[in-house]
Amino acid sequence: MKKIIHVSNFNLIRLKGCFQVGFPFKISNGLIRNGYSVLNYPDRDLCRMFGFGHMNFIGRNRLNKHLINFCKVTEPDAILIGHADLISNETLFEIKRLFPALKIM
């Protein structure tokens, strides 16, 4: 079974589950129904958590480091980026360097 990390704005903390029928959830559910193992990675919620309640440069830096460590632990086959503007290109290049066979979509 292929592992996919879905990086998107899931609004889990801020809106308290208000948008659980949004597009990120629909994309994840569609991938699960097609036989993939999907790990949802809420980038904006984690940035707020790492930035002490605000989306600031401290949260962004820690978020990018956390994504690299998260990929090292989970060893995904693909990363699906959905409106994740907080993830830097350098982070994606570093993940691609660590896992050359990884697909970034």
Predicted regions: what they are:
Residues 2-17:
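Nucleotide-activated donor-dependent transferases that construct or modify glycoconjugates
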Residues 9-10, 22-30, 34-105:
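Extended catalytic core of nucleotide-activated donor transferases of GT-like folds
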Residues 1-2, 102:
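Generic cytosolic/nucleocytoplasmic N-terminal low-complexity/intrinsically disordered segments
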